[in-house]
């Protein structure tokens, strides 16, 4: 999976897919009432990127729906997976549940069109703080209450704070997510900082967990990877996805002889919740 990083304006969906991304990551900010408000990152953000691109969340979800709805003039068949980087820092452990409920309702209305022929992409809820696990519980509850529990088949989960894997597993379980129930595990650091500061040790541990008989992880991705050498290192470590500001760099590496016969770009027909067995 080539995961286009910080796609917060609608026009960027085409920009990143044109460069080779089959997945995008979008930042979601919340207001004082725990309601998702904007697709927006703000400062600081990755080097070589403008940090202030934004849309109102409803507008962005409508645009995303069109990009992932077959038959729509804006449809991009390559775009199969969307990571919502949920900026829950302003939520508390007690308002996280409310935030999840409200976000579930918003996705149901603006992305899934009330469950009637909405966008088809798989969705990952990526949360930076283990203490906010109740966001997931609230999200699931919102879809169940609305009578659309079936949409949870399209939803996966990630904690992005580089926490201890055992603690991450506990937080997922508390949220009602079973081991290997649509679990992606991220690991990484901003592209402004050398990967020497946070190498691939944690990513390799996550890959080992994914491949063990008693792990909790389905897929592992590394962020934010823009340099050719770092991409090769991540692929050699066995990741399933690479989050990047430069999707074309990943495409070029995948076309190198070392990887060409071994790895390919995922399509919509590849289930992102199934652990890949080469």
Curated annotation (Swiss-Prot):
Q: Which BP terms does GO give this entry? A: killing of cells of another organism; lipid catabolic process
Which keywords describe this protein according to UniProt?
Answer: Cytolysis, Dermonecrotic toxin, Disulfide bond, Hemolysis, Lipid degradation, Lipid metabolism, Lyase, Magnesium, Metal-binding, Secreted, Toxin
| The protein's Enzyme Commission number | 4.6.1.-
Question: As annotated in Swiss-Prot or TrEMBL, what is the tissue specificity of this protein?
Answer: Expressed by the venom gland.
Q: In which residues is Mg(2+) bound?
A: 25, 27, 85
The superkingdom listed in its UniProt entry is Eukaryota
The protein depicted here goes by the name: Dermonecrotic toxin LhSicTox-alphaIV1iii
